[in-house]
Amino acid sequence: MKGMLRMGLVAVAALAAACAPRERTLVLLSTNDMHAKIQRFPQLAAAVGACRDTARLVVLVDAGDRWTGNAYVDMAPTPGMPMIALMNELGYDVATLGNHEFDHGQAFLGRMIDSMDFEVVCANVVSDTCTFPQLPPYTIVDRDGIRIGFVGVVTNYEGPG
């Protein structure tokens, strides 16, 4: 009887230890308003790489205005594409739209979204006349059982004047 009780207590203790919450650190890295500053990408890549070397759980996101504002990127065969290629290479997880993502029109924006290897979310661009695919309003990124929700929202910008 004592052996059964002891075995039962050991089993309960083992189960409790397995179910105990464990402390984990998740690092959230965010960029925004990069405005095609391609010359700064090596520093960004080094910082992200160093973070990934020391932290196991890293999520990389962007809040928009990424591909216009630099002559080299603006005049590329596909304007903006150098930034998207670098962001794909760096392994972004999620992005939303900024007002400057619309600078070249909706068809261009749709092509750029198709070129991204990461999720693009935006909750407040809803229109029957959009020429790019309807974007999901949010996404959930899972890192080792930690679930983080991201909702994309773009500023309501109608332009000057």
What is the predicted role of each segment?
Residues 1-8:
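Bacterial N-terminal signal peptides that target proteins for export
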Residues 8-11, 149:
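Small side chains
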Residues 10-20:
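Hydrophobic h-region of N-terminal signal peptides that target proteins for export
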Residues 19-161:
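Acidic, metal/ion-coordinating pockets
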